[in-house]
């Protein structure tokens, strides 16, 4: 039995991990006032004071419950199936793999947070693209914390890519200097084209490589620019719509891993339910949400 599907979950893997203690969790954001060097007159008394917490704000997100079910009839478990040693265990393992993909796609989506309001309207966690303002800025994110580094013009060139890095640096100073770009397949290919120069009917490369290996490497997995270093990881779970297999190949999340976290209320678990006569059945579940500590720490392409 062979199952060959995309399963890499780079965003969840690199994000910080935290514990949620309720259905809604919050972080605080603040800013610094603009640099001022007007000076102070000699002998001038201090008569005015600033409230340094005036701009402080709380931004938060809901958890979301994820679940995958599985069941195996009595006969299906008893008969020999080619390539499957245990039908119930195989079904359970498949559900776990699907659950991981569900969560990755949710936190990399543009869905907004939602409180549970009854049947058909469950808790939903805000996805990273929505945190960064795709489809409109979230109402709880103050202006000073909103994302400003992005490009939605289409095909990426080195100039447009560097412009986003410059915007990010100007917004937050790039304190870590180490970014990760989770890139759709088309965006990943466009970045690899940065080393190419247009000429004639095709592209010309200018590379110097040792000939002993008898191979040519034409890929970009680490980009070092004027405004930081970017590790580039491909993904097919960016900006997805729930239940759709459509891949947004041009999408990309430019993430500073220090400023995102997964808050888990219930860790991934598997449960077997009572066999009511028809066969063994069960489910795997996860309850967690995405915290973005500061939207302007990140960028996106779309």
Question: How would you describe each model-predicted region?
Answer:
Residues 1-302:
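Flexible, glycine/threonine- and acidic-rich loop/arm segments that mediate assembly and lattice contacts
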